[in-house]
């Protein structure tokens, strides 16, 4: 897992989303060779998870409460929202790879989001 600073909707029908990963990231090949991914949107009170997933720690899920989605991707408990995605297509984007996934399932709750704005996380 990793922390990303941008995530976007691509299409409503089919439901497609995207994010990008720098090709130098240690987990780059894991994501590139996977059948998809989960996006877990953090709440305002989950700044610690943002820091954890941006760290070099290998087993980031070790002390977390999480379940596998129907597609086999990790869904972290108590997040604002999650999207379970299967690989639609991946595109070259210079020093990044753009990962487009088809949303197979999702969920959300009414909580305040964790935001990154003006070079600050809050």
Which residues are covered by each model-predicted region?
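Basic, polyanion-binding surface patches
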Residues: 1-122
């Amino acid at each position: 897992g990793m922390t990303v600073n941008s995530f976007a909707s691509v299409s409503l029908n089919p439901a497609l989303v995207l994010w990008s990963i720098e090709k130098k990231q240690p987990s780059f090949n894991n994501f590139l060779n996977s059948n998809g991914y989960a996006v877990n949107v953090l709440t305002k009170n989950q700044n610690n998870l943002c820091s954890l997933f941006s760290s070099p720690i290998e087993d980031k899920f070790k002390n977390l409460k999480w379940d596998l989605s129907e597609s086999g991707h990790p869904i972290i408990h108590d997040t604002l929202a999650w999207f379970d995605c299967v690989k639609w297509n991946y595109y070259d984007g210079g020093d990044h790879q753009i990962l487009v996934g088809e949303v197979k399932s999702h969920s959300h709750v009414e909580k305040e989001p964790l935001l990154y704005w003006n070079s600050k996380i809050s």
